[in-house]
A protein has these predicted regions:
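Hydrophobic faces of well-ordered beta-strands that scaffold small-molecule active sites
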Residues: 13-16, 45-47, 77-81, 104, ...
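Alpha/beta enzyme core
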Residues: 35-37, 90-104, 108-118, 129-213
């Protein structure tokens, strides 16, 4: 039986799992403004990453449950979990699988010290044997739930240094349907440019394994336009977009610039003229952008007001409110707000000017 990965149109595009960013409120906006019939088989959503250990006790599960809520409009959607305890990963993934996700992804790339010190996230890169056991435990949990959903892994090219030839083959020995590679080491964080040239070597390793595993590249992707060019140039099956989606819930359904425009201007020197770059945030009229920001704020307050600080929304405000006259002053006022009603007042006052 085919899993959802095998039914995707190529190239496909993935929403990166980002803590306090890709929550149900932001994914709701991305689904509403970014998904449609034409691209539904080309866009995959990820949840925020969730602690398997936390899901294994009653209090923790209650506290984390909002991170695993999703709507049908978001499908296909993958739940990402992290942990270094096989028993807890099995138990947690049995629960996660029962919620109806299309797949489960294991985080083996987060460089945060609090995660790495547990042996989880990028800490797995230093312990390939445990990493393989964790993949097996996740499959066991899914089976215990009576489900048949695929398992994928998101990782990096190495820990302190590039270790593709030793680390990636260990993952390929296990039953994974897709492999997402953040093209930096854990030590590099996001401080250096992602090395997309590594994709070729990883593709060769997958081919050598004899398995049908999809390869997803991640790192420094500006938008869908940039993602398509990277797929064409490097040959990956899909691309994951992280920071490029901030403040741009329209991103996944944007048109792309012509090949000639792209080659002439390049991703790093765009002037974002609407006719040239229909995928840019600037292609959206300012009033609409601010109204969608307000809608996002209201939905956040409705769905997550009891679970998260309102300050979480302020990183979104910084992204929505950028690149136009008066943006700085508007951001300052938005940073002082404490609820959606206050945001509405600030936005309305600005639009009256």
């Amino acid at each position: 039986m085919q899993n959802f990965w095998q039914k995707l149109d190529k190239p496909f595009f993935c929403l990166a799992p980002m803590s306090d960013v890709t929550d149900i409120a932001f994914r709701h906006m991305l689904a509403k403004y970014g998904k449609n019939r034409e691209n539904r088989n080309k866009v995959v959503f990820w949840t925020e990453f969730v602690s398997a250990d936390g899901l294994c006790n009653k209090l923790g599960r209650k506290k984390l449950s909002h991170m695993l809520e999703f709507s049908e409009s978001e499908r296909p959607i993958v739940a990402q979990v992290f942990g270094a305890n096989g028993d807890n990963m099995k138990k947690a993934c049995q629960y996660v699988a029962s919620l109806g996700f299309d797949g489960i992804d294991i985080n083996m790339g987060c460089p945060d010290k609090s995660v790495v010190n547990q042996g989880a996230g990028a800490g797995m890169i230093k312990n390939p044997k445990l990493a393989r056991e964790i993949i097996q435990a996740v499959h066991a949990g899914i089976k215990s739930a009576g489900c048949h959903i695929p398992v994928s892994v998101k990782t990096r090219t190495g820990f302190n240094k590039e270790g593709i030839d030793t680390w990636i083959p260990e993952l390929l020995k296990e039953d994974i349907s897709a492999l997402t590679i953040h093209l930096r080491t854990a030590k590099e964080l996001s401080l250096v440019p992602a090395n997309w040239d590594h994709i070729k070597k990883i593709k060769e390793l997958i081919k050598k394994s004899g398995k049908d595993i999809l390869l997803i590249g991640n790192g420094d992707v500006v938008d869908i336009d940039d993602a398509k060019r990277k797929c064409e140039k490097y040959g990956c099956d899909g691309v994951m977009i992280g920071r490029g989606v901030f403040g741009n819930p329209w991103l996944f359904r944007r048109g792309v610039a012509s090949k000639e425009t792209w080659e002439r201007d390049g991703a790093s020197t765009r002037n974002f003229l609407v006719k040239k770059y229909p995928c840019s945030l600037e292609a959206t009229p300012l009033k609409e952008r601010l109204q969608v920001m307000l809608e996002h704020t209201r939905f956040f307050e409705k769905m997550l007001g009891k679970h998260k600080s309102f300050d979480v929304m302020k990183k979104h405000f910084k992204a929505y409110v950028n690149g136009f006259e008066g943006a700085k002053e508007l951001r300052v006022k938005l940073m002082e707000t404490e609820n959606a009603e206050q945001v509405e007042d600030v936005v309305n006052d600005f639009l009256k000017l």
